[in-house]
Amino acid sequence: MNESEIPIDIHTLKLQDWLISRRIVPKNVQQELREIHRKISNALQDMPSNEQLIKLLARTNINYYHVKEIIEILKQTEKDTKSVFGTYGSQRMKDWQEISRLYEKNATYLAETAQIFVRNVNYEIPGVRKQMARLEQQADETQKRAHDLNKPESQILADHSALLEQLGVKGDNLHAEFVQVLSGLPELYDKSLVGIANIQPGIDLYAEVSGNKQVLPILNHLVEFGNTTVYQYIHKEAPLAVEEPPIRLNLSEGNASKDDNAVAEIDFGTDDNGGTSSTVSAEIIDYGDFGSGDLPESDGGNIDWGIESAPTDAVEINFDIPVEEYGIVVEGTGMDGGTAKGDQAYTLLDSPNYRDRFLDEIYELESFLRMRIYELKQLESSSDIMFSLMDNIATHDGESIWKILVSVEKIIQQTSDKQTQHLFQLKHSPKYANMLATKLQQMTKAVEKLRATREALKQLTIELREQRQDLNPVLEELIAQTRTLQSHIEKDISKRYKNRVVNLMGGVN
């Protein structure tokens, strides 16, 4: 094989050292390059107006091959200054020809071309590719983050809708809607006690087993009389009038409408017996003054009553007649003459104190019934008959007790459901309305913030992908430039070694 047929393989990382070791370029080539770049900067200050030049000079880095192109363009623009000897009188042409000679001296152009080629292969192209990959990754992550925000938004919207549903409001005007739903609270109480008569056998069984006939007094009262006022439960008689404390919804200005900032005083329109209240307190009725001292003495005037009176003897009037026998409630007895006020005006399920006692009793009854069912199951599975558990089995077997327990659990569920709890707190806690309104407002703001964030992330994703696309022509131009430089280097070295094939290893892909 001839020497000319043996290829020359040069690794890109060792290209510059190879050129110096073969004494193709000097070691101090950097000083010559700095001088050349200084002259290029000065020459660029005086350039003719030409579209080709403008396009060429738009490149950031001017190398030897650009200088050769500039000279070819100047041959056209400066042809008027050309002498018969082939020289140019134009200073522009002289400057660029001098730059070209400096490049060709000591093969400085080859050293610079090798530097640019190595820099592009090792840094510029990988850097652009990494930037593109990073932008693509950021776009994917941003898109995923925007998609992940759908889940918390849906959860908050579901919680918001659930809370509004529990409260029975739409959320448009909370103050007015709170007032409206609170008016239906007595109906909720009545609905929760529809089947309370079914637990009477359980109460009787508990009283018989415990030996205490006065056990569970509130449940007994509810079964017999229903959800009456606390006044009736305490005094064993219905009040003449009910003056329930006004309800105060302390909603802040941001949570209430302009016309609803006043204190809400709600009249539920029901008395303790479930009917429409039409009683009026005796304190506000003016009966007039009919004392005997103010009546004029008369013999009855000229009024003929149509009654024939017979002469009678003087009769002594007995004022000690028991008015109770005639169903008369005397003013001054009971509480302000039979008017339920304050906490006693609330119903048993509506009173904070008595509601807790009711829940204690209903849970106590539930525990007793569960224990009773457990004991009956143990009795059935045990070979030794426990005589202490034989009482009432004939009338209350496991199935009958289970039916009572189902009724008890239904009452517990209905009296302790979310809507009843919210409305109860809303009525008796002045700050609860504002707390609910604030919570709803925070949910709404959270959803708005999530939506704004998602839109911002979507916009950022679009921008990142656009930046990624903008780098495509940059990368293509770098690759094209690098391949051109590689071709120049291989051809130049090949000429120096009898046109042997030169391969730059590790070049651009």
UniProtKB/Swiss-Prot annotation:
Superkingdom, taxonomy of origin: Eukaryota
InterPro entries linked: CDK5RAP3 (IPR008491)
GO biological process terms held by the UniProt record: regulation of cyclin-dependent protein serine/threonine kinase activity; regulation of mitotic cell cycle
UniProt KW Magnesium keyword: no
Keyword Cytoplasm part of the UniProt annotation: yes
Principal localisation: nucleus
Compartment(s) of residence: Nucleus; Cytoplasm
Pfam assignment, any one: CDK5RAP3
Keywords assigned by UniProt, alphabetized: Cytoplasm, Nucleus, Ubl conjugation pathway
Cellular component GO terms, alphabetical: cytoplasm; endomembrane system; nucleus
PANTHER family: CDK5 REGULATORY SUBUNIT-ASSOCIATED PROTEIN 3
Function of the molecule: Substrate adapter of E3 ligase complexes mediating ufmylation, the covalent attachment of the ubiquitin-like modifier UFM1 to substrate proteins, and which is involved in various processes, such as ribosome recycling and reticulophagy (also called ER-phagy).
Family: Belongs to the CDK5RAP3 family.
Protein name: CDK5RAP3 protein homolog
Organism this protein belongs to: Drosophila melanogaster (Fruit fly)
